[in-house]
């Protein structure tokens, strides 16, 4: 019986060593050599301190900063561990809302967001990505239109000329990946960091 089991054990050990040890180590080593920044999380630093990742959105709420898309991520309720509470951009619990288009809770949330955005900028149509959450709840990007929509609010809050803020948006537009994948986009963290360097007029 041991004779019949031996080939199975040999294959098990060989494949475990190959796929569980050799392959992961080779891929990790290759990533560290070829793409060290990406392999380590595309971390963003300011004055030597890590302040975020270019791949994970943050919950900017101040009028002085550009805001990202709505986020449906949650966290455990400290008062009752069987329930959850909203926790926008919680990277430990990436998720969408799973609310269907006819769900009243979704309609109410979108209406509240629309009303707030229209009060902030009554002149321009509200870009769709400012009222729709991404599937992960962690999208670090918004459309150039969503960034430009927020220019008047940010300029007012910072005492900057709208033209200066608009130029910052235009300078931070990322093109389609490889020139054809996806849409032009703006990384909210990168834009807000550029904004912090701008001087009041």
Curated annotation (Swiss-Prot):
It is a single-pass membrane protein. One of its GO terms (cellular component) is plasma membrane. InterPro entries: KdpC. It is found in: Cell inner membrane. The chain crosses the membrane at residues 7-27. It comes from the Bacteria. Keywords: ATP-binding, Cell inner membrane, Cell membrane, Ion transport, Membrane, Nucleotide-binding, Potassium, Potassium transport, Transmembrane, Transmembrane helix, Transport. GO terms for molecular function: ATP binding; P-type potassium transmembrane transporter activity. The keyword Glycoprotein does not apply. Coiled coil: none annotated. Pfam families: KdpC (PF02669). Its main location: membrane. The system is composed of three essential subunits: KdpA, KdpB and KdpC. Belongs to the KdpC family. Part of the high-affinity ATP-driven potassium transport (or Kdp) system, which catalyzes the hydrolysis of ATP coupled with the electrogenic transport of potassium into the cytoplasm. This subunit acts as a catalytic chaperone that increases the ATP-binding affinity of the ATP-hydrolyzing subunit KdpB by the formation of a transient KdpB/KdpC/ATP ternary complex. This is Potassium-transporting ATPase KdpC subunit. It comes from Xanthobacter autotrophicus (strain ATCC BAA-1158 / Py2).
